Amino acid sequence: MGKIIGVDLGTTNSCVAIIESNKPRVLENSEGDRTTPSVVAYTQDGEILVGQPAKRQSVTNPKNTLFAIKRLIGRRFQDQEVQRDVKIMPYKIISSNNGDAWLDIKGQKIAPPQISAEILKKMKKTAEDYLGENVTEAVITVPAYFNDAQRQATKDAGRIAGLEVKRIINEPTAAALAYGLDKEAHGNRIIAVYDLGGGTFDISIIEIDNVDGEKTFEVLATNGDTHLGGEDFDSLLINYLVEEFKKDQGIDLYNDPLAMQRLKESAEKSKIELSTSQQTDVNLPYITADSTGPKHMNLRVTRAKLESLVEDLVNRTLDPLKTALKDANLSVSSVNDVILVGGQTRMPLVQKKVSEFFNKEPRKDVNPDEAVAIGAAVQGGVLSGDVKDVLLLDVTPLSLGIETMGGVMTSLIAKNTTIPTKHSQVFSTAEDNQSAVTIHVLQGERKRASDNKSLGQFNLDGIAPAMRGIPQIEVTFDIDADGILHVSAKDKNSGREQKITIKASSGLNEEEIKKMVQEAEANAESDRKFEELVQIRNQADHLLHSTRKQLKEVGDRISLDDKNSIEQSLKELELVMKNENKGDIESKVQELIKVSGKLLEASSQKYKEKVNDSKSDLNKDKSETDASGDVVDAEFEEIKNKK
């Protein structure tokens, strides 16, 4: 059985880990980094860049450089949060045929799971390079407060990337696994995992029970906000910088995509610097220009100013903390340890607010960037049998139910119910002689059905005519370990049954997923061919350089015909290198190697002559030394220490 990799598919950064020799190990990517920016770029020549290479070129290619895509995954275009992003993102967010939020890249419609799949492919390749074998299975993390549609879309992304997603695991739960795996304390411990990442916020209250070496991780309650994170902190700082520049120069940078991309990079850097410094300078020469000439941005930002800008965002995280504790029937004093996860928790203001809320300092022995991937790898180890004596009991973050008469949501499974779980309830018809019922599946905490998230609907027909209230329709909700819902409806009288795995009325259908998988495979083949083309071009370039050097050094030692043949072959190779045909370049490389044989011989002969000359000089020097026979006494004297 191959390794099951653990992937933290983050909004800002992603990370991959494995279990090796019973210990989790975070893997370095091809750039040598342990985390990879969750950035994907589509270049003008059709190449897809992922991670740091994509981030580096974002300033010159803002419209085709995609970041924070996790905020769009599994969402509808008309969602309030998506509409907010439509206004501020440099890339184009559009509505798909079924109302999902998709991307328009150079006129091509692309689904968010396809973008996430590119990041997952990079994680997969990182693991394969380290292990030296194919990787086909993964545990992928999601925010605890992700709904069914977002979880399903994440699984779709894994599938498009060529991975069988063995388990979807909540990020705070994964962090708890990473924290609790090597802790030897016996008995029960209650931990709070505060996870503030690039785009999402979660709080989970988790009980770790250690009895005779067997550890149980039970999630007692979870809460959060799937559209609150570091990107929002960046946006507020960017807004401030734009307004200050407008006051100073009278120019609105919002109309300049290149300037905004530079500003975004600088704002992110400044925010990070202000976690360790009291002030920083935002210095962007030639940020824009008008009729009077180029304009430069040079603004000083203090930590106090940044904190005043983002304090409301930090305060927004406190209500979910209260709700989670209330749902778990616990007080603040019951919490033994507080763990901070996500890069944004490095901000001193965040740490201060969390510390004040829980009346204790958060632990510092958990790496906020790597803990989630490590926990995912641990869960992968549990599933493959590499990790023993660990039991994970996760929960569903939101209530699940159906719409009943009067537009009311009737819950079948309450939020914070341990999963996997199954629940049935009997309903009846609303009208006389009703021959079919529509099961409208909902997720959320509101009483009015329309105020909750619609996960989809299906019909159960063929119900025998009867007075209203007589037919018995048994509706069963079954949530699997990934938190994905399966629903069935059964007419108890006729035995007629209808079952579905809930796919949001949005989401990708099977045909779309298969097409995207095929495209991903085709891209992989295209990437391989591109890599081979680069390799042969590099080989050709090296051969051109070395042949020209030899021609300069020993060209006078070969015949004029041979010299002309080599020069002609050099020109032909140089010309063919401009094309995309690998076979043509290979052919001309071989041709140049063949015709430059005489040149190689001449070069080799010159080297031999040089070696022989050196030996001759050495022998001459030696014979002169032997002939003299004189020995020179060393003029040393002994110096005795004075006493």
Swiss-Prot record:
It comes from Blochmanniella floridana. Residues 606-625 have a biased composition (Basic and acidic residues). Residues 605-643 are annotated as: Disordered. NCBIfam families: PRK00290.1, PRK05183.1, prok_dnaK. GO terms for molecular function: ATP binding; ATP-dependent protein folding chaperone; unfolded protein binding. Transmembrane segments: none annotated. Induction: By stress conditions e.g. heat shock. This is Chaperone protein DnaK. The gene is dnaK. InterPro entries: ATPase_NBD, Chaperone_DnaK, Heat_shock_70_CS, HSP70_C_sf, HSP70_peptide-bd_sf, Hsp_70_fam. The lineage of its organism: Bacteria, Pseudomonadati, Pseudomonadota, Gammaproteobacteria, Enterobacterales. Belongs to the heat shock protein 70 family. PROSITE patterns: HSP70_1 (PS00297), HSP70_2 (PS00329), HSP70_3 (PS01036).
